[in-house]
Amino acid sequence: MKRLVVTGILLLVILFTSRAQHMSVSTNVLGWADYGTINLSAGVSLARHISFEVGGQYNPFSYQRQSGLTVRNQQKTTFAGVRYWPWYVFSGWWLGVKGQWSEYSRTGIWRFAVDEGKRYGVGLSAGYTWMISKRINIDFGIGGWGGHLYDHTLYHCLKCMEIRETGPKNFIALDDISVSLMIM
């Protein structure tokens, strides 16, 4: 009986360990530096060279500068995508494609105007994942996305809230500059 229990526990540990190497959880350290944007993503290996990833970003914060200027990069973002890894999943170079949706409100970062709206689109990215240990990687990436802005309004400033531009339009933007900590 004792041998059966030990064998069962050993089998579960082996199965769990092998499964854990096919899944990852990561967070973008540079994202946290972007006015405290909370971000998390989870990935799973679909094949030797393909992985699937889902994730999101959330930033409810608004800051006041000493000059009285409000600064914010508020957002709710979700995405799902796949990555192609020429070497092995979660190791080395990769290319990615994703679908993304975002609701945002930002002001005071690059200009005084207030930009609010919702958008969806498709993104392309590339990067390199460096293996630190068996369970920890650092992921470097850069990418962009394009799509459609809907429910979009651009105001002259936060105080006057005079509408400068409104309505749907298309966009292309740099999106992912990431240095992520990945745990497998």
Q: Model segments located where?
A:
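Gram-negative (and chloroplast) outer-membrane scaffold detector with strong preference
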Residues: 44-140, 180-181
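Predominantly the C-terminal beta-signal and adjacent terminal strand-loop region
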Residues: 133-184
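Residues that define the transmembrane beta-barrel architecture of outer-membrane proteins
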Residues: 21-23, 34-38, 74-78, 116-122, ...
